[in-house]
Curated annotation (Swiss-Prot):
SUPFAM superfamilies: Macro domain-like. PANTHER family: GANGLIOSIDE INDUCED DIFFERENTIATION ASSOCIATED PROTEIN 2-RELATED, MACRO DOMAIN-CONTAINING PROTEIN. This is Uncharacterized protein Saci_1252. It comes from the Archaea. Pfam families: Macro (PF01661). Residues 1-178 form the Macro domain.
Length: 181
């Protein structure tokens, strides 16, 4: 299941139900924790598919720079994934940190892709796993950020969600918000 949206800022947004580790994009965004310890969910899947080098580079990043603040990002190579980079976005925990931190994590992921002069990025439903964010809130925030963003090099955003329920909610929100350009 795939649906595409063309935004007024020139971005093409593709919503897909699938495995983010299998998509082809210049960068894959990982839903990470502040210590970049990739022990579950999307993070574990990315390390399993891309190789342990991703975890090693993440550990080195934290050793050198300290924990990544909520709402911020860090970058590693992508190992064996069909991408050049993994952008590790630290999303908030629902009900603990605010929606502004989720908005920041998504926006910083797009900005980092532009800083790296990338044309495509794959985004998961950040913070909807163990961090408990409802799909609808994540989808609304994501659509807002994508519509407001002013891309430099970025042309395509693949929003890759896992499961029929997530896909259905994201599609409903995107149909209502991204077609209104």
């Amino acid at each position: 299941m795939v649906v595409a949206y063309k935004l007024s800022n020139g971005l093409e947004v593709i919503l897909e139900n699938g495995d983010i580790t299998k998509v082809e994009a210049d960068a894959i965004v990982n839903a990470a924790n502040s210590y970049l310890s990739h022990g579950g969910g999307v993070a574990l899947a990315i390390v399993r598919s891309g190789g342990y080098i991703i975890q090693e580079e993440s550990d080195e990043y934290v050793r050198r720079n300290g924990p990544v603040p909520v709402g911020e990002v860090a970058v590693t190579t992508a190992g064996k994934l069909k991408a050049r980079y993994v952008i590790h976005a630290v999303g908030p925990r629902y009900g603990i940190e605010g929606d502004d931190k989720l908005e920041s994590a998504i926006r910083r992921s797009l900005e980092k892709a532009d800083e790296l002069k990338l044309s495509s990025i794959a985004l998961p439903a950040i913070s909807t796993g163990i961090y408990g964010y409802p799909y609808e809130i994540c989808a609304r925030i994501m659509s807002k950020v994508m519509k407001e963003y002013k891309p430099k090099f970025l042309k395509r955003i693949l929003v890759v969600v896992y499961g029929d329920q997530a896909y259905s909610v994201f599609k409903k929100v995107f149909d209502n918000s991204l077609y209104m350009n």
